[in-house]
Every structure is written in structure tokens, then in C-alpha cells.
Amino acid sequence: MIHQKGYQFLQIGLASPKQIRKWAERILPNGDVVGEVKEPHTLHYRNQKPEKDGLFCEKIFGPIKSGRCACGKYERIPEQGEGKKFCKKCWVEFTYSRVRRYRMGYISLGCPVAHVWYLKSTPSHIANLLGQKLKDIESLAYYNHCLGNPSTNYPTLLFIKKYFQYSSLAWLLHILLCFFSFKGFEALEDREIATGGDAIKRLLSELDLQNTIDESRKACEELAYFDPLDEKEAQKAQREKERLVRRIKIASYFQETKIKPQWMVLSTIPVLPPDLRPMIHLNDGPLATSDLNDLYRKVLYRNKTLWELRQGIWPAPHSLMISQKRLVQEAVDALIDNGLGGPPMRDSNNRPYKSLSDVISGKQGRFRQNLLGKRVDYSGRSVIVVGPHLKIYQCGLPKNMAIELFQPFLIHYMINKKLASNLRVAKSIIQSKHPIVWFILKEVIKKHPVLLNRAPTLHRLGIQAFQPILVEGKAILLHPLVCAGFNADFDGDQMAVHVPLSPESQKEARLIMISNRNLLSPATGDPITLPSQDMLLGLYMLTLEDLQRNFSFSQKQCLKKHTNFNQMPSFISFEDVIKARVERKIHLYTSLWLKLKNIEAITSYLYQSPIEIQYNSRGTRSITYEDWNICENIEGEKISIYAYTTVGRVIFNQQFRSALQKRIDY
């Protein structure tokens, strides 16, 4: 049990065999030590009671019914401080049945086995740390190859070194077995050769981490001065450099956390509490069981057979021992991560078993479903829709959601301002949705940010703070620029709203988590608030020249611009264009001529050829280009300049200039 005041953080890492035993072992009043699961049995087929020393043993994990032992005897559960009570016959503790949710057991393996996460993951941590090929380490772990002269402290008899195939030495081992007793042969074999998890454990235990780091750094420095002759050598050098960097990182992690590398090889495996892998009686009779129970049983069956072969009176054939050790390794692999790096272990219905990795990983796993996916007070959830009128640091919060989330703050405000005499009166006013409630709610949320979160929260931009704005409806309004950080779009995505309660959390939300302070990607440093999807499509539609583009651009210029200058609508300001659109005299895609104020700033027409020049009786002339119409007097001075544009482009230009001016003034 984790106490909120006793522990400030939770660290996940490798556990030593001693630590695993410490989790499970308990000393009974008669001096017996319990905790080790020895039998592969679960429940007795007749009375459906847990088997002794099995996977559901009450002596190890606690009683099934509170205060009742395995014999059926009932006693009062002692209070805290009174001391523990045990049945003198079956030695089951009289306690609550909920202890079966956290009491663990362990299995003592007959041979060391390599942890499949560190052996077969990509990249392999064991192979990387030892500086060996993954193929060689896997062959060693699964007893296809042997390691000669595993320890350099003693003179050897067989004079063999490094890796060799087991079958090439099987005949010699068979002859030696005839001249030695079984115990003597085991001692000789341990000194001369090693294979399986035992060989990997010896290599890891003899590893000097600091020396490994120094050698890898020296090799990296040599590669930095290496001048490759061709691209193939350059790629090979780059791969070697990446491998050395990974090796330095892994060795440094082991040093910093004070974890020993040999703990990646298991000699003891923990057994989950029985209530986390239950067996349930169905109405029609059969038992429904967790896949973990079947996987634990496979490990126990194979491990028990191995112990019997090792402790037998007559020595077992060496090939049989090797085969049984390989079976134990495969069973433990399936228990930890079924199907990693090979075909999965299946049940009678040809369905792959769900291993420990499957139980804790993914959306339905223990972490995301049960630990991180809990319901939280002062939180809500709704569909997100686009809010283009919002600032980047604002979000639209539905009124009905806001009145529930901020209800404690509303009650506090009403009682302080003497608007309600007590809690009950304040709640009744809020439930009646009196007009004053909306006024108070607006005042409350002005100084109170909210947190928006979209699952899965894969990086820190998955949860950001916003200033809420009350809106009608039931959907949360979100600025489209912040969608990239959440990896969200407006096709039905849902987001959760959380209210920070403490002053510290509110301060952190305003200063650190507010969306306008999270404009860069934490991974690459590139801008993450870039227009995309709906924004780009909206800008394209707004600035589109004509919805029916059935002929080329040059043809359109000839047909519309220089022939119809006087027939097309012309305006002298942005305001006149907006006014005409409001009055529905023109639509969004209407082409028009707009008079520009800054005449001298326009120079792009100098690079174009005039399409048409018109003279009038006063001596002035009108020159029409592809995008401009310039009126000049007799001296050649510009009188006016008109730009060819559309209503949508005028709106875009006005909004862009307005936003830019506000930024400059700020």
C-alpha cells in the first residue's frame, strides 16, 4: 500500500532476487517460512478449495473469507496492535480477505533464465551491454551454444574458450559423465563450460561498468577521427557509433540507479496476488480463469520437473537436462511477454495467452485503465468543435458544464457577498439557474484557468491550460492552432476538462501550462502551433478567386480585367467592401477593384506588360495590368492605383493587418 504522505514518488526498475523473496516471505509462529509457491495446482477438483503450496494457497496469500481459516474455523479478526492470530492446524492467518489483493508469492527457479524484455527487445540491452551479437546471446540463452572457460580464476581441463555449439561437445560430456558422480560432473561442468541463463549471468556479474563506459567512450573518439573511404564504410561507422552510445547510456543508468546487471537474469520470479488473477465459478458449472494462472502453471510444472531431474538419485542424461532448462526459459518468456521474438504460446482453442505485459500495457492495461483512467472530481468531458473567434489561450466552456465544475466557487462567492445565507440556499439558487448565477459565473471564471487534456497524453503538450469563455451548447470550443499539440481534430474527438483547485496549481497553469507559452515542440524545438487542416482549407476557400475555374488564368485576365474595368465594381476602402457584403450587394467570391492609399509602395507592376492603355480628353490615361489599374496625369504622376482582388481576400488582408498591428502595439 502506498501512503500519500510517506512516499513522494514511485520508481519502476529491476528487483534483486533477495528483494523478490522479501516481498513474499513471512515467518509463521512455528518458525516456518512461507511465500514460495511449489505446486502447480490451483483448486481441488472436489471441494474447490485452494491446494496447499499452490497458486491460491491460503497459507501464503491469506484467507478466502475474512476471519476463516482453511479448516473452516472462524475467529474474530484482531484489531490493530493486538497481534496476529493463526490457526494451529493449517497455519492460516485470521485476517481480512482483502490481503489476497496485495500479498505476493514467488517461484524459485531450478536454473537462471534471461529476462525476455532485456534479451529480445530492440535493441537488446543484454547484448548491447556485453558488446556481443544478439544472435550469439540468444543461442547462449536457449542452450544452442555454450560458453567455454566462463571463469578465469581456475585452471581448466577441457581447454575450450569463447562460444561453441553444444552438440560438438556432447560426446565428450557423455564420456566424462561415466567417470564422475553426478555432483562431481555438475561441479566440473560449472567450472569448464556454461550455457543458458547461467552463462549470461556470469558474464554480466564479471562486467566492470566504469571500464565499459571508458572503453566505449574511447572507441567513440577513435570513430570521430575515422575517415571512411566510401558510403558503405561511413554507414557502418555510424551504426557502430550509435551502438557505443547506447552501451554508454545503459551502463550509466545501471551505475546511477545502483542496479546490478546480473539482475536481468532471473533466478526467482514473483507471483501476483490471487485476486489479480482470479478463478470464477460460472453459473453452468465450469471455471473461468485468468490466462496468467495457466502460464504460472506451465512454469511450475516445468520447473518442478527440472528440480526432480537435478535432485534424483540417478543422474539424468545431460541432453535431457538441457532440454528441460530450455523449456523453463520458454515458459518464463511466455509468462512475462508471450510472443516477443517468437511464436506465442496458445491454449486449447488456439488463442494466444495474455501475459503480464499484455495485462499492464495498452489502453485496457492496468496503468491506463485502472491507475491513470480513474474518474476525477471537478472534471468533465465533451466533444470538441472549432472556435475560430477565440484567442489561442481561450477555450469555449459550455454553460451547463461550467456551472457544475465551478459550483464550490459559486457557493463561496454567494455566501461571501451575502447573496445566500447558507450552503443549502446557495445550491437552490444555482439549481434554479437564476440570471444572477450567470453573472457570478462570469466573474468567477475570469480569474480561474482550466486544464484541457486529450488522451493519450504522450507528451507534456497533451494537457494545457486555457482561459474559459462561457458558450451555449454542449461542445467544448477549441482554437484550431493548438490542435497539433493535442494531436486532435474536429471529427468527433473528445477532451477532458479539469479545474485546478490549489493556488499553486492555478499559478502553474497560468505561468507554465497556458497554451500561448507552449508554442514549440518539446521534442524537436520546432514551432508546433502551425495552421493546418481546417485553417488551411478555410484560408483557401476565403481567398479563392472563383469557384468555377473552367478556363485558364491568362484567359480569365483577358476576358475580365482589361475589357470590363468600368463594368466591375470598384471601392475606395476596405470598409466599403465589408459594408457592401453585409448589405448582400456582393458575395465572398465577387471580383472587384480596390483603391489603395499608399501609391508609391506599389512597384510590382513594373515587371509586367500593360494589357490595355486608355486615354481621355483631359490628357489622363488609365493603364491596366494583370493585377493593377493605374491612373496617371499628363506629367506621368500617379493619381490612383486600383488592385484586382476579391471580397474574401479583402477580409483576409484586413484581419491580417489588424492582428499584426495589435502585436506591434503590444
Swiss-Prot record:
GO terms for molecular function: DNA binding; DNA-directed RNA polymerase activity; magnesium ion binding; zinc ion binding. Its main location: plastid. It is found in: Plastid, Chloroplast. Zn(2+) binds at residues 69, 71, 87, 90. It catalyses: RNA(n) + a ribonucleoside 5'-triphosphate = RNA(n+1) + diphosphate. Pfam families: RNA_pol_Rpb1_1 (PF04997), RNA_pol_Rpb1_2 (PF00623), RNA_pol_Rpb1_3 (PF04983). One of its GO terms (cellular component) is mitochondrion. Gene3D superfamilies: 1.10.40.90, 2.40.40.20, RNA polymerase II, clamp domain (4.10.860.120), RNA polymerase Rpb1, domain 3 (1.10.274.100). Its EC number is 2.7.7.6. GO terms for biological process: DNA-templated transcription. Mg(2+) binds at residues 489, 491, 493. DNA-dependent RNA polymerase catalyzes the transcription of DNA into RNA using the four ribonucleoside triphosphates as substrates. In plastids the minimal PEP RNA polymerase catalytic core is composed of four subunits: alpha, beta, beta', and beta''. When a (nuclear-encoded) sigma factor is associated with the core the holoenzyme is formed, which can initiate transcription. This is DNA-directed RNA polymerase subunit beta'. It comes from Chara vulgaris.
